[in-house]
Amino acid sequence: MFERFTDKARQAVVLAQEEARRLGHPEVRTEHLLLGLLAVDGESAATRTLTGLGVPLDDLRAEVEERIGRGEGAPSGHLPFAPQNKKVLELSLREALQLGHNYIGTEHILLGLVREAESGAARLLAARGADLNAVRQEVARQLATGAGDRAAAAKPSKEGLIADIEALYDEIGRLSREVHRLTDLLRRHGIEPDQGTSRSA
């Protein structure tokens, strides 16, 4: 269903929701999506781009978490994406099409974040020298060396990619509901999911 997204791009979007829940926020904002990009397993085109711009990833993560703080607790069930974040994913699609790519990778999500200049994530990145022009140039340099999040897929239509993004929202919701169901199941058996220990132990 999500063949247009690279594995790392899908992982970043799912991790964004996990970051929002971990920090006790009621919706997934651009800062959470940035944290999701930073949390992807191993290197990604996005983290290579930021490193190439001299942005220390651990410092950036700490700054993002400090800026958005902790909420009073995320509601149970699916966490919605903030409208600004939906726009970021739409901009990611446009960046992919503009580059002539038949996939959406973490580099395109990063471009979408910085292109939405009024977002919290974009302001944090711009303060560290990672504005739209700088990121575009570094992404181009990374792609020239074959370092993008490439995926083998037939060239899609714009409508097909938009449909994939909408399907991704649905899948995120399904995964969130499943996590919530399993969490409730563990608690009914006296196990706190965060600690993985029984109350009776």
Give a label for each model feature.
Residues 1-201:
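Histone-fold recognition with a strong bias for associated Lys/Arg-rich disordered tails
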